[in-house]
């Protein structure tokens, strides 16, 4: 298990672009003629908030990612929100054994999850997305956390937006 420093976190800056995905085998000519409306992030934000609790698994269920919490920021009633903040928890059921050592006595204690009971090591990632963008592209920052790669984060964001779309068809 990778060590997380309790007093510091690495934060990376990204650009998030919202676009459409074709889920059919349309020709490039047909795809080029599509003018599907793409909602702005400020319109999607309240719908993303409703996805709180969404769970998705990776690596044959060994990694389980949960959208643990979602908040619009700032929280002040007289201000319009400018950002959406996501708390994403990832549980790795294949994490290695953690060893805690007392440097005074040299006593070592091994701590290992009960994998057969669904336990694993949990880490959290924070994602902050601006609600104001340019050409469907929004500033985003996220904490760098072991087990939550940029690819996995993109996959989860796609999943969240897919669930938003499913819940608002029609």
Residue ranges and their predicted role:
Residues 109-169:
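Intrinsically disordered, low-complexity linker/loop segments enriched in Gly/Pro
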Residues 1-104, 146-170:
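Terminal interaction module
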């Amino acid at each position: 298990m990778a060590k997380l420093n309790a007093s510091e976190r690495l934060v990376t800056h990204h650009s998030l672009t919202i676009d459409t995905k074709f889920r059919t085998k349309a020709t490039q000519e047909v795809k080029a003629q599509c003018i599907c409306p793409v909602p702005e992030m400020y319109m999607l934000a309240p719908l993303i908030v409703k996805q709180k609790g969404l769970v998705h698994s990776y690596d044959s269920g060994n990694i389980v990612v949960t959208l643990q919490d979602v908040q619009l920021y700032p929280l002040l009633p007289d201000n319009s929100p400018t950002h959406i903040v996501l708390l994403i928890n990832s549980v790795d059921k294949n994490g290695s054994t953690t060893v805690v050592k007392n440097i005074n006595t040299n006593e070592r204690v091994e701590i290992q999850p009960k994998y057969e009971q669904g336990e694993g090591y949990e880490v959290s990632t924070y994602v902050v997305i601006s609600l104001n963008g340019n050409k469907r592209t929004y500033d985003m920052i996220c904490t760098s956390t072991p087990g939550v790669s940029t690819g996995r984060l993109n996959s989860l964001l796609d999943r969240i937006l897919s669930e938003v779309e499913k819940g608002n068809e029609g």
